UniProtKB/Swiss-Prot annotation:
GO terms for cellular component: cytosol. Keywords: ATP-binding, Cytoplasm, Kinase, Nucleotide-binding, Transferase. HAMAP family: Cytidyl_kinase_type1. Its main location: cytoplasm. It is an enzyme of class 2 (transferase). GO terms for molecular function: ATP binding; CMP kinase activity; dCMP kinase activity. It catalyses: CMP + ATP = CDP + ADP; dCMP + ATP = dCDP + ADP. This is Cytidylate kinase. It is found in: Cytoplasm. It comes from the Bacteria. The gene is cmk. Its EC number is 2.7.4.25. One of its GO terms (biological process) is nucleobase-containing small molecule interconversion. InterPro entries: Cytidylate_kin, Cytidylate_kinase_dom, P-loop_NTPase.
Amino acid sequence: MKDIRIAIDGPASSGKSTVAKIIAKNLGYTYLDTGAMYRSATYLALQNGLTEENVPEILDQLSQYPISFGKAADGSPKVYVGDVDITHPIRDNQVTNNVSWVAAIPEVRQELVSQQQRIAQEGGIIMDGRDIGTVVLPDAELKIFMIASVDERAERRYKENIEKGIPADLETLKKEIAERDYKDSHREVSPLRPAEDAITFDTTGVSIDGVVEFIQEKAKKIIDKG
């Protein structure tokens, strides 16, 4: 039995992170939240009043305050910049609405991608994002591209925000998600698209358990072959 690398890509709020975390726990794999890394870079930029005109300064912040992952007492993942816990602040709407321009900076992507590739070398890892199967882990043994309707994704984000006590308006979320889709799929650097050998899975109307089961079955076939 071998440890494989699983890449899950897809648009915002398609359920990638939720599914990836469950599968990582079930398989005993490491979950590397790439979206959280870009959110962390965005958080650092916003905290320091930086824009796309300040690329060297953003890279300097990433060097001074490296991004790392840990676990809370209940096993849930935590995200740090330096020694500061930013697990919750990086889910703020201001960060969400600015992450696209930070993620589109080639030098920022290059720095974070090299960190991700180093971590994934040993296998036994699951990563989700926008370009894992195409750029970060083009040789991953299993690649999944998850899609879902804008309405369903807005509903998911709305429920998540309400549960976390974050104010939310459903129509605003629909508009923001549609705009994010356009930005992510039209950016010059690593646009959102499925890898040629990815399995595209429309999760509209499919339960989280159903999605997890589908991906785990695919993973186990590959693991058993090894």
